[in-house]
Amino acid sequence: YDSFKIKVGRDVQSDEERIKAIRRRVGENVAIRVDVNQGWENSANTLKALNALESVGLDWLEQPVIADDIDAMVEIKGKTTVPVMIDEGICNARDMREIIQKRATDKVNIKLMKCGGIYPAVKLAAMAEMAGIECQIGSMVESSIGSAAGFHVAFSKKIIRSVELTGPLKFKMDIGDLKDCYKIPYIQLNHQPGLGIEVNEDKLYQLMTSSYCIE
């Protein structure tokens, strides 16, 4: 791997220590991407942490503050050279318009399950592309079906520079066969119609909690 994503956000000081320790362990040639999941809460905590982490050389910092505090993201972006990414702060086109108008971020993390599916995700990516904001297709630990949809969106726009669709790799049992397409650290989709996923109905029935037949 040439990059790592780290989840932090419980305590700023301990987060700083963990990130520095990881940098020491992996060396200087591996990209470190930090996802705070809103845990640093505000711009003051975030800027303090970024100052302490200046020597680490972060690839980007994801959603350090509360989701709806777009103004805090504006402040952070204006006071650091570390690229910042909005995740929880974007769910729909209205959010994207505000982000673009305020120039609040360098990157956005688009999640199909959060924004409403394939078409809304492509729409958000198109808006970001016009504003020069790079995109990532994010994961909510979905099955092969959801992950395949995300990969197809990712391949549709050049502005989508990264993906984190690893849900199928984390499941003991998955209803689809996308796992066969992972060629770590790459993904190689097939040429089958639709999403290219074959649903295993036996596994589907094993995982179902209830079913209804509509005639």
Which role does the model predict for each range below?
Residues 169-170, 174-215:
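C-terminal extensions of enzymes
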Residues 6-8, 34-38, 62-65, 86-88, ...:
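A cross-domain feature marking catalytic cores of carbohydrate-active enzymes
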Residues 1-80:
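Metal-dependent enolase-superfamily TIM-barrel catalytic cores that perform enediolate-based chemistry
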Residues 11, 118-119, 140, 196-198:
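Gly/Ser/Thr-rich beta-alpha loop segments that engage phosphate groups in nucleotides
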Residues 51, 57, 68-85, 90-186:
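Shared catalytic-loop signature of beta/alpha-barrel
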Residues 18, 142, 164, 199, ...:
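Short amphipathic alpha-helical leader/targeting segments
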